[in-house]
């Protein structure tokens, strides 16, 4: 009996030791914050704020929870990178490629996404108030439940994108284009700038949304909806 117990304890101890080693290796890999920027790098939860990372290749990288506050990521390859819950406040991703990237639940106030190619990216539940998406390719992007107050979409391509349940208060879509229907189901349109926008093929729009938005005589609406007698906004 004593020998069996000793062997059992020895085996249990070995298993525990192996588990500890694997756990340590996984933790070390997750905290590889000193690794250079490279495709597939694992920077999860690392501090990368106030850095110049312009032109880097971070395709497929694990960037979950990274602090990129005020970091320069312009002209970078962010293809399929995972930025979930990352902090990108006042960072710049201008002119970067981010097709299929994950930006779920990021914190990105006043962030520069201008001219970014983000086809098929996900910004679900992201906080991107006052951010700049001017001239960006946002086709088939998911902005479901995103906070987009005062965001700028001048001349952006938003074809096929989804803004359902998003907060678009004072967001500016003037000059935006789309060749495939976009979904505005129950999005908050308080003083959203839609002057000159052809929304005739958009989906999910209701009269109550238009009544609080800012359009003009050139704004085209889906069938069954009408222009308010007076749009709320009269100044640019």
PLM segments and residue spans:
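Bacterial N-terminal signal peptides that target proteins for export
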Residues: 2-14
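Tandem repeat scaffolds
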Residues: 29-235
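Exposed boundary/loop context
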Residues: 3-6, 23, 33, 38
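Bacterial N-terminal signal peptides
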Residues: 12-23
